[in-house]
């Protein structure tokens, strides 16, 4: 990174803070290939194929320096003389290099912020099952929650105008507009109500997405400060990490870092009445007492997206649900919370009267209906919960198919092991077990009955007795002990990956 800053200072002294001339520097494309640099400035390399090499990057830089004007003139022609038959390859290389250039102001600002603000670290790692548990001290005071998908179908010019506040180089903005209008359709694919980036997409569009989210949340924070007389209790930006750190008692000290598909930072806002947490392309918004505050912010968000970002967003897509009747979906895992009231009776010394203190207990439950809905989206069952085979898995080996089903079953079982009323998990295990059998029977072109007889009953024991085997290694094998452990809340600490079902939602 020091070498990168040295190159940057050299070009700044010559070009008077212009970013556009850096496009003709060959070392910029070398930095685009450097994985170490990418890790230091938060962005992962989008990846090249085997045809991409330093020679191709040098040829693209030389072509850009020699025929940049001819490329703009031939943009409307049927055969682009600048890119030729390697249009996609050269455009990808140039966009990767341009992405490194426009990241310069942001990366330097990020490094400067890290020098001023030290991130507290803890090496006592918690499992991914504590995603919801780290909010348990605050859930007891919340009543309503909204789970909203952030819209992203915005006009290309709005993206350019957003970057005008950060990048002052007009030439770079014109080149960005050229990339967007010519290669937008080849780099992104629309799905549902959000634009999902393909794995082979350039980092440029990943950068544009983060810029859009950053602009939206700055305006969101400004509206919050203008609409309330109370100052925000805490707000901040959490930079992504891979592991979850230890849960600390106070929420505004909790450091929750994770790696996600959009490479976005985690942002949260907390005040006495409203909580806001964003992850990936969604955000949670929760409040207490009445849904009046949630309806007000619903109007704010709809007007912000429609009039500022020119995104048509239907107000009906923002549902305001009671927290006790709603299941939260986070990184592929679903959890529902239930607040049980308990009374603690205490007696003052040397006094005859008793004091009853009513307390709310945070308790997670297994949301069986949303879980079956996730299995239906992943083609493990139909809409009625009847198991079906997965044709896409028939090309894999038998061991890979069984391991995949067992891993999903084990993760769901371990994740909800600390929940109450875990008997509904038997339905989920049944769907996964029978779907696995039907997939294997379809692969071997046999009936389910014939394949089960051939497989034997030992296969089903792997789905059913795993928890009992773990318990038997720790506790004595007695009926009362196993029954108490089954009903009790025991958290597993080995779930360190995102649920496989998240890839299909």
UniProtKB/Swiss-Prot annotation:
Keywords: Chloroplast, mRNA processing, Plastid, RNA-binding, tRNA processing. InterPro entries: Domain_X, Maturase_MatK, Maturase_MatK_N. One of its GO terms (molecular function) is RNA binding. One of its GO terms (biological process) is RNA splicing. The keyword Transferase does not apply. Pfam families: Intron_maturas2, MatK_N. The keyword Cell membrane does not apply. GO terms for cellular component: chloroplast. Coiled coil: none annotated. Its main location: plastid. It is found in: Plastid, Chloroplast. Belongs to the intron maturase 2 family. MatK subfamily. Usually encoded in the trnK tRNA gene intron. Probably assists in splicing its own and other chloroplast group II introns. This is Maturase K.
């Amino acid at each position: 990174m020091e070498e990168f800053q040295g190159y940057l200072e050299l070009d700044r002294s010559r070009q008077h803070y212009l970013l556009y001339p850096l496009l003709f520097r060959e070392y910029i494309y070398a930095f685009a290939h450097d994985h170490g640099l990418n890790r230091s400035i938060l962005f992962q390399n989008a990846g090249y194929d085997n045809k991409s090499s330093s020679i191709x990057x040098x040829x693209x830089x030389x072509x850009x320096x020699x025929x940049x004007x001819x490329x703009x003139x031939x943009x409307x022609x049927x055969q682009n003389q600048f890119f030729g038959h390697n249009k996609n390859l050269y455009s990808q290389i140039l966009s990767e290099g341009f992405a490194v250039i426009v990241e310069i102001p942001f990366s330097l600002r990020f490094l400067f912020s890290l020098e001023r603000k030290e991130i507290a670290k803890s090496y006592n790692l918690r499992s991914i099952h504590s995603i919801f548990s780290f909010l348990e001290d605050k859930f007891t005071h919340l009543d309503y929650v909204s789970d909203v998908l952030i819209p992203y179908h915005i006009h290309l010019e709005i993206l350019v105008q957003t970057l005008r506040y950060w990048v002052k180089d007009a030439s770079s903005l014109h080149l960005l507009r050229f990339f967007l209008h010519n290669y937008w359709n080849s780099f992104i694919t629309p799905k549902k109500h959000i634009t999902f980036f393909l794995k082979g997409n350039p980092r440029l569009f990943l950068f544009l997405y983060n810029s859009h989210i950053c602009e939206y949340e700055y305006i969101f924070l400004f509206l919050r400060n203008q609409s309330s007389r109370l100052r925000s209790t805490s707000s901040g930006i959490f930079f992504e990490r891979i592991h979850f750190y230890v849960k600390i008692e106070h929420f505004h000290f909790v450091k929750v870092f994770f790696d996600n598909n959009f490479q976005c930072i985690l942002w949260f806002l907390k005040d006495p009445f409203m909580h806001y947490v964003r992850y990936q392309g969604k955000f949670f918004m929760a409040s207490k007492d009445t849904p009046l505050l949630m309806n007000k912010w619903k109007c704010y968000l709809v007007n912000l997206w429609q009039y500022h970002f020119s995104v048509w967003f239907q107000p009906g897509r923002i549902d305001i649900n009671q927290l006790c009747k709603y299941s939260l979906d986070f990184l592929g895992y679903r959890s529902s919370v239930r607040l049980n009231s308990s009374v603690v009776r205490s007696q003052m010394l040397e006094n005859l009267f008793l004091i009853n203190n009513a307390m709310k207990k945070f308790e997670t439950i297994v949301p069986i209906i949303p879980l079956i809905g996730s299995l239906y989206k992943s083609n493990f069952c139909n809409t009625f919960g009847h198991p079906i085979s997965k044709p896409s898995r028939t090309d894999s080996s038998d061991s890979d198919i069984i391991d995949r089903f067992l891993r999903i079953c084990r993760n769901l079982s371990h994740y909800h092991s600390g929940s109450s009323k875990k008997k509904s998990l038997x339905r989920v295990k049944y769907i996964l077990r029978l779907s696995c059998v039907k997939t294997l029977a379809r692969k071997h072109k046999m009936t389910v009955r014939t394949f089960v007889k051939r497989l034997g009953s030992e296969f089903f024991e792997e789905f059913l007795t795993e928890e009992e085997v773990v318990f038997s290694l720790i506790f004595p094998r007695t009926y009362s002990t196993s029954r108490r452990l089954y009903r009790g809340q025991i958290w597993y600490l080995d779930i360190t990956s995102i649920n496989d079902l998240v890839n299909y939602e």
